């Protein structure tokens, strides 16, 4: 089996982390994240809570990676998008009166 190269990314408002890791073919999303070292560098990453993706496509920890994939670790939302839209619509309605 040959090795594959994948990127693991985690972005904060003021800093971005990008790690390129070499893994055995057939490696999982979880193995890539562990190999990147981001779990020890950032204690705010919780693989049971943070959502994950590969090029914006949702994935699970057990999904197999391919050469050139970019594993993205997403931060939790600070506000519920539906609730924010509802509040904006309510404000717009009140301002229009």
Curated annotation (Swiss-Prot):
The record, for SUPFAM superfamilies, names: MoaD/ThiS
Sorted alphabetically, which InterPro entries does this protein's record hold? Mopterin_synth/thiamin_S_b, RnfH, RnfH_sf
Name the source's superkingdom. Bacteria
What's the short name of a Pfam family annotated to this entry? Answer: Ub-RnfH
The record's annotation in Gene3D superfamilies points to: RnfH-like
Tell me which family the UniProt entry assigns to this protein: Belongs to the UPF0125 (RnfH) family.
Listed name of the protein = UPF0125 protein plu3376
Which source organism does the UniProt entry give?
Answer: Photorhabdus laumondii subsp. laumondii (strain DSM 15139 / CIP 105565 / TT01)
């Amino acid at each position: 089996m040959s090795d594959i190269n994948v990127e693991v990314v985690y972005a904060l408002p003021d800093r971005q982390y990008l790690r390129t890791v070499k893994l055995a073919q057939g490696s999982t999303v979880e193995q890539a994240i562990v190999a990147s070292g981001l779990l020890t560098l950032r204690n705010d990453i919780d693989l049971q809570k943070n959502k994950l993706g590969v090029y914006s496509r949702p994935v699970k920890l057990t999904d197999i990676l391919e050469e050139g994939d970019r594993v993205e670790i997403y931060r939790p939302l600070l506000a519920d998008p539906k609730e924010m839209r509802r509040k904006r619509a309510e404000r717009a309605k009140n301002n229009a009166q």
